[in-house]
């Protein structure tokens, strides 16, 4: 059996451009593609933190070192310059390979420069444990 797992994530990237009349896709700075282990033409999910929009497109190379994140084509209607987004990709992993599988998580600053990277998501604690719930 194959399991679909998070493979790559660029967290809180800032949209720098929206090009409605460009071919569809999302241009991503090549430094970020490399850091997140994303390939040109790879399917990506984009989740817009500002407006809640979620959509699927594919990655294309953006100029290295520029911080470009350009949402293109019809998807440009779902984002605006300055919006914060999460870019994610998934992989189908055979169960026999699950133990060694780790996602590549990339965290960026306001200029879309890599700040740090991780290969795990920490356990989320309850913000306000409810009284009376069993432990």
From Swiss-Prot:
For this chain's UniProt record, which GO biological process terms are given? Answer: alanine biosynthetic process; pantothenate biosynthetic process
Q: Which GO terms describe its cellular component?
A: cytosol
Instruction: State where substrate binds.
Output: 57, 73-75
Q: Which residues carry this modification: Pyruvic acid (Ser)?
A: 25
> Which pathway does it operate in?
Cofactor biosynthesis; (R)-pantothenate biosynthesis; beta-alanine from L-aspartate: step 1/1
As its record notes, the protein acts as a catalyst of: L-aspartate + H(+) = beta-alanine + CO2
Task: Provide the alphabetized UniProt keywords.
Answer: Autocatalytic cleavage, Cytoplasm, Decarboxylase, Lyase, Pantothenate biosynthesis, Pyruvate, Schiff base, Zymogen
The cofactor remark states: Binds 1 pyruvoyl group covalently per subunit.
Q: Which domain of life is it from?
A: Bacteria
Q: Which GO terms describe its molecular function?
A: aspartate 1-decarboxylase activity
Q: Which InterPro entries match?
A: Asp_de-COase-like_dom_sf, Asp_decarbox
The places in or outside the cell where this protein is found are: Cytoplasm
Q: Which cofactor does it need?
A: pyruvate
- Gene3D superfamilies the UniProt entry points to: 2.40.40.20
Active-site positions on this chain: 25 (schiff-base intermediate with substrate), 58 (proton donor)
Protein family according to the UniProt entry: Belongs to the PanD family.
Q: Describe the function of this protein.
A: Catalyzes the pyruvoyl-dependent decarboxylation of aspartate to produce beta-alanine.
Subunit comment for this entry?
Heterooctamer of four alpha and four beta subunits.
Name of this protein: Aspartate 1-decarboxylase
